[in-house]
Amino acid sequence: MDCKRRQGPGPGVPPKRARGHLWDEDEPSPSQFEANLALLEEIEAENRLQEAEEELQLPPEGTVGGQFSTADIDPRWRRPTLRALDPSTEPLIFQQLEIDHYVGSAPPLPEGPLPSRNSVPILRAFGVTDEGFSVCCHIQGFAPYFYTPAPPGFGAEHLSELQQELNAAISRDQRGGKELSGPAVLAIELCSRESMFGYHGHGPSPFLRITLALPRLMAPARRLLEQGVRVPGLGTPSFAPYEANVDFEIRFMVDADIVGCNWLELPAGKYVRRAEKKATLCQLEVDVLWSDVISHPPEGQWQRIAPLRVLSFDIECAGRKGIFPEPERDPVIQICSLGLRWGEPEPFLRLALTLRPCAPILGAKVQSYEREEDLLQAWADFILAMDPDVITGYNIQNFDLPYLISRAQALKVDRFPFLGRVTGLRSNIRDSSFQSRQVGRRDSKVISMVGRVQMDMLQVLLREHKLRSYTLNAVSFHFLGEQKEDVQHSIITDLQNGNEQTRRRLAVYCLKDAFLPLRLLERLMVLVNNVEMARVTGVPLGYLLTRGQQVKVVSQLLRQAMRQGLLMPVVKTEGSEDYTGATVIEPLKGYYDVPIATLDFSSLYPSIMMAHNLCYTTLLRPGAAQKLGLKPDEFIKTPTGDEFVKSSVRKGLLPQILENLLSARKRAKAELAQETDPLRRQVLDGRQLALKVSANSVYGFTGAQVGKLPCLEISQSVTGFGRQMIEKTKQLVESKYTVENGYDANAKVVYGDTDSVMCRFGVSSVAEAMSLGREAANWVSSHFPSPIRLEFEKVYFPYLLISKKRYAGLLFSSRSDAHDKMDCKGLEAVRRDNCPLVANLVTSSLRRILVDRDPDGAVAHAKDVISDLLCNRIDISQLVITKELTRAAADYAGKQAHVELAERMRKRDPGSAPSLGDRVPYVIIGAAKGVAAYMKSEDPLFVLEHSLPIDTQYYLEQQLAKPLLRIFEPILGEGRAESVLLRGDHTRCKTVLTSKVGGLLAFTKRRNCCIGCRSVIDHQGAVCKFCQPRESELYQKEVSHLNALEERFSRLWTQCQRCQGSLHEDVICTSRDCPIFYMRKKVRKDLEDQERLLQRFGPPGPEAW
């Protein structure tokens, strides 16, 4: 529904045609969604049909239950019937999806120690077996701990005394909190470890390992030790903590060698099944000691993904006119759900729960309720019956789930908010805020649903893709190539209050809104990619969706450090230091009608770190090399003056991690090339991508000044080597490939950026450029230490180099006789901070220049578009600009167009006004001279409805001018480009619409003009007395214009009917992401005006008959 698309109600994907023309070709075929619903009955395997009806996981007494009876549930919706399992003879093997912990009492285990206290930390792993059974594994016996260096003179005799003192200090500190049921410190042990920060040359030193009773005691224990704890005979030394800021789950996974989403095995006889007094709704619930858990690395057969159950859902609300739905007052009228078993091609479940009767939908089960309370409880019971592992949808995190929970609370449906897998644990809503320089501030909500993974596709797209608009319609068109009907929230109430057929139409629409996120999840491989990223980095799946980047590197660092007896210190950061970034070789701007070879350093920053052994563990402090007596060939001095020992002295942790990641990626790519199974290919592709991203993020981890372990010396040394290598590559290429050395021409590096150089070898064919590019890459690589390697990547021909970070060209990579694509970097063709007209014009101009090799045609086309703009012939959908509302109006330093418009819209209609985090669509309208641009922003629909004039001069000067000059100056010359494009006859004719509201119109009187000569007439007729002889001719002309408008409107109407999947129902779509919507609105208004004009001719006279 439209009311939940508030995360960016901006304009959509740029249309295929510039200049506002109607799409005569390539019209979308009628929607097949409703027909596809009928496939449900054909996609279930025979064995599912033969299974006996299984036992429904009954809700906890007093918490859930309700209106969704077992008779309403198709047996195929439930999990497979649980087979008999004997823990004494059969192992339990499952893929874990989520790991968390709680504090409780642990039941006794075979061969395990008896619990010594009532409250102990217990880890909880939720997962799925190969047969599809849901599992909850309670893992006991693991306690939180951290390290600290032993003070000078500290011996074994001080251990008990320090433990007593620390216990007493923690007990005093925790007096105001929960009372401890036993000692806070379980043990303190002496051990030999070494800090990973810096090379000291003395090897391991004495450390204390402090084990605590509960994870929540880590913070106070660390603080008290930093302040100082009395040790008899040693005074009150201060203790520096190591690994005290590591999450309890990460600590356990590192120690147990468990990675995210891998397969766990519980050996026979080592675990106990909970048959009674289960704490969760999972089919299998077991207890096991942490040391008995076998973790399988995700390789070979253990790379597979279990048959996870994925649920996608969408809700519809009946809001009041002009007011955004509020859960305290506005009812939930429909909840539609689709279920998919991972690995199967089609959903196995389609369910529409509706308030009031609804006509049947082919291929879907429809259940109707008279009371909203019953509808809500039925969906909650359905969740427990279906038992999804992953829940997805579009904006479910900030709208659907919070609305359902809040609405149930308002209606006092007390048994509703138990949507997780833990018995009696409520699903609560918590506000969350994220802010960064890249994305600004984003407010969101977090809904606890323990045991189920939430994957909101809107949040995924916001994090991973830069789009012009993030409405479901826009992203579906961008990634899936299909549009959807978008119904305004005010119309939804009318459909609900209609009849069974209107409610059926609403249910089909709601089912489509639940179906598209599922399609996006599969098409973008979101689940597979995140599972593989969790496996590669070693963190739980949920961390990837809710946490930042650093935890992924910390996990890998801890694993590698543990094997070598190294510890990670707790570093306090200020975040004030900065360093010089990568080198950009000054571009030789111009239009190159010769092949330009691009040479690229493969994994540049990881390669530098490996080649030069750059790591925390190899860093030498100033003067340390001399103090340690290191020989000159045992350490290096980086271009920034920092020193690191070579791998012959000590192999760094980071280089080892990077080697493992890159070698694993190489293996994954080799397996991918041989694999034929589509599911295995998806997993392998996701794995190689996760390995690549993880390798590249290691450098960013060292450079993050506010982070777990920042190290300016590493990050600035990496960029220093990178700058040096780019410059050396330029020198090597230009010195070898010369006429003196027998080549056809002197090579020239025309541009270099971070990890690549663009070379002009002076040859005329792409094949020759490819050959020389490969030769040059191999020759330059021989001058750098392994594994640094320069590779031939592609050839641009022709190539338009505009400035730093801005260029375009036809890309050849695999074949020399056909280009792969037109590649643009940094140009308005790929940017989203301007109107679609700019992207379309830049793209079409580049296509004429690069593909057609017709610069004159490109100039002529640009002049035509500018003329159309000034004459008001461009469709308004092409002129819409979108900007994200990242802060409140008061927080912006200056006035912003989109912020001011949002405030005005809020005063007009608070319900439909944009909110924080939305992308605000606007156009710039004409106003008095000197009015600031931010005051001229207006809602595109408001502009259409009130015929407000567009400020075409603004679009020419502020939107089109600079992008066009950037493209054409290298071709026409700096002085000539402006005079040819922005001056001349094509800019002299302008058309300005007359506004229907505001301004001087309030003080003027409208008078009729003759349709023929435009002179003022003092009667209601159509023509003056001088044009009366031509009245029939003028009438025919206006009738012809009316017919053309009617035909255009019919074509647009039919196109919208095809999109909505019905050719006999009214079009109610209001998708602002669709250019057809604006065209339809404009033509409807033009039709009304034309009909009024024809009425001035009056009824036909007797002579007409």
UniProtKB/Swiss-Prot annotation:
A GO cellular component annotation in the UniProt record: delta DNA polymerase complex
Family: Belongs to the DNA polymerase type-B family.
Cofactor: record remark: Binds 1 [4Fe-4S] cluster.
Disulphide-bonded residues: none
CysB motif (motif): residue ranges: 1056-1074
Role description: As the catalytic component of the trimeric (Pol-delta3 complex) and tetrameric DNA polymerase delta complexes (Pol-delta4 complex), plays a crucial role in high fidelity genome replication, including in lagging strand synthesis, and repair. Exhibits both DNA polymerase and 3'- to 5'-exonuclease activities. Requires the presence of accessory proteins POLD2, POLD3 and POLD4 for full activity. Depending upon the absence (Pol-delta3) or the presence of POLD4 (Pol-delta4), displays differences in catalytic activity.
Organism for this UniProt entry: Mus musculus
Protein name in the entry: DNA polymerase delta catalytic subunit
SMART domains: POLBc
Binding site for [4Fe-4S] cluster: C1056, C1059, C1069, C1074
UniProt-annotated binding residues for Zn(2+): C1010, C1013, C1024, C1027
InterPro entries tied to this protein: DNA-dir_DNA_pol_B, DNA-dir_DNA_pol_B_CS, DNA-dir_DNA_pol_B_exonuc, DNA-dir_DNA_pol_B_multi_dom, DNA/RNA_pol_sf, DNA_pol_B_thumb, DNA_pol_palm_dom_sf, DNA_pol_type-B
Region (Disordered): 1-31
CC cofactor: [4Fe-4S] cluster
Subunit structure: Component of the tetrameric DNA polymerase delta complex (Pol-delta4), which consists of POLD1/p125, POLD2/p50, POLD3/p66/p68 and POLD4/p12, with POLD1 bearing both DNA polymerase and 3' to 5' proofreading exonuclease activities. Within Pol-delta4, directly interacts with POLD2 and POLD4. Following genotoxic stress by DNA-damaging agents, such as ultraviolet light and methyl methanesulfonate, or by replication stress induced by treatment with hydroxyurea or aphidicolin, Pol-delta4 is converted into a trimeric form of the complex (Pol-delta3) by POLD4 degradation.
Gene that this sequence comes from: Pold1
EC number: 2.7.7.7, 3.1.11.-
Post-translational modification Omega-N-methylarginine, affected residues: R19
Motif (Nuclear localization signal): 4-19
Record's keyword terms, sorted: 4Fe-4S, DNA damage, DNA excision, DNA repair, DNA replication, DNA-binding, DNA-directed DNA polymerase, Exonuclease, Hydrolase, Iron, Iron-sulfur, Isopeptide bond, Metal-binding, Methylation, Nuclease, Nucleotidyltransferase, Nucleus, Transferase, Ubl conjugation, Zinc, Zinc-finger
Gene Ontology molecular-function annotations: 3'-5' exonuclease activity; 4 iron, 4 sulfur cluster binding; chromatin binding; damaged DNA binding; DNA-directed DNA polymerase activity; enzyme binding; nucleotide binding; zinc ion binding
GO BP terms, alphabetized: base-excision repair, gap-filling; cellular response to UV; DNA biosynthetic process; DNA replication proofreading; DNA synthesis involved in DNA repair; DNA-templated DNA replication; error-free translesion synthesis; fatty acid homeostasis
Zinc finger extent (CysA-type): 1010-1027
Activity regulation, free text: Regulated by alteration of quaternary structure. Exhibits burst rates of DNA synthesis are about 5 times faster in the presence of POLD4 (Pol-delta4 complex) than in its absence (Pol-delta3 complex), while the affinity of the enzyme for its DNA and dNTP substrates appears unchanged. The Pol-delta3 complex is more likely to proofread DNA synthesis because it cleaves single-stranded DNA twice as fast and transfers mismatched DNA from the polymerase to the exonuclease sites 9 times faster compared to the Pol-delta3 complex.
Cross-link (Glycyl lysine isopeptide (Lys-Gly) (interchain with G-Cter in SUMO2)): K572
